[in-house]
A protein has these predicted regions:
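N-terminal targeting signals for export/organelle localization
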Residues: 1-40, 152-153, 163-166
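Loop/turn elements at helix/coil->beta-strand transitions in domains of secreted/extracellular proteins
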Residues: 58-61, 90-93, 117-119, 146
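Structural microenvironment flanking redox-active thiols in thiol-disulfide oxidoreductases
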Residues: 74-115, 124-131
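Short active-site neighborhood of thiol/selenol oxidoreductases, capturing the structured segment around
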Residues: 52-71, 94
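Thiol/disulfide oxidoreductase modules built on the thioredoxin-like
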Residues: 110-118, 123-168
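A short beta-strand-turn-helix
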Residues: 33-35, 40-61, 84-87, 130-132
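Short, conserved catalytic or interaction motifs in soluble domains
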Residues: 13-16, 75, 99, 146
């Protein structure tokens, strides 16, 4: 009886037609989840230069969602600049998306200068936040590989060394 049951289970699983059409794995994964594709975006950074997904193709990309009032963000950002200084020549880039809230009391350009940040910083509009799957907390860091696939997502503070360990295999 056991052999018959196992045989029927095996036979039932041999259907030639799948229940749903096949889709690329990345397309089936929700935005902002590990394995999802980097969303298409085109934004102006704080000085007014256009930053697009197109110019990031073929690079390892760290996306950082931050705010001027966020203490963990202030601790992380200089480390991301150090990683950019170290790995930029190998095709690594950092883009910072600033949350625009009533808590902001410091000019973001002065804030970046004070922290020694030279990578592009743009405002995280609601549309941008949604394209990245919604942002659950600050800081939120996302690391995409050269094919634009999300390989690491960190919500909250993380030491630069841990981010670097996740980053190095992608370079």
């Amino acid at each position: 009886l056991l052999c018959l049951s196992l045989g029927l289970l095996g036979f039932a699983g041999c259907n030639e037609h799948s229940a749903s059409p096949s889709t690329p794995v990345e397309a089936a994964i929700a935005a902002g989840e590990i394995g999802s594709r980097m969303p298409d975006f085109s934004v102006k950074d704080l000085p007014g230069r256009q930053v697009t997904t197109e110019e990031l193709r073929g690079k390892v990309v760290l996306i950082d969602f931050w705010a001027t009032w966020c203490e963990p963000c202030k601790r992380e950002m200089p480390g991301y600049q150090q990683l950019l200084d170290r790995y930029g020549p190998q095709g690594f880039v950092v883009i910072g998306f600033k949350f625009d809230t009533m808590k902001d009391t410091e000019d973001p350009m002065r804030f970046a200068k004070r922290l020694g940040i030279h990578y592009p910083l743009a405002v995280a509009t609601e549309a941008v936040k949604q394209k990245f799957g919604g942002i659950e907390g600050l800081p939120t860091t996302m690391v995409y590989d050269r094919k634009g696939i999300l390989r690491e997502k960190i919500i909250g503070f993380e030491y630069t060394e841990a981010v670097e360990r996740a980053l190095k295999p992608l370079l």
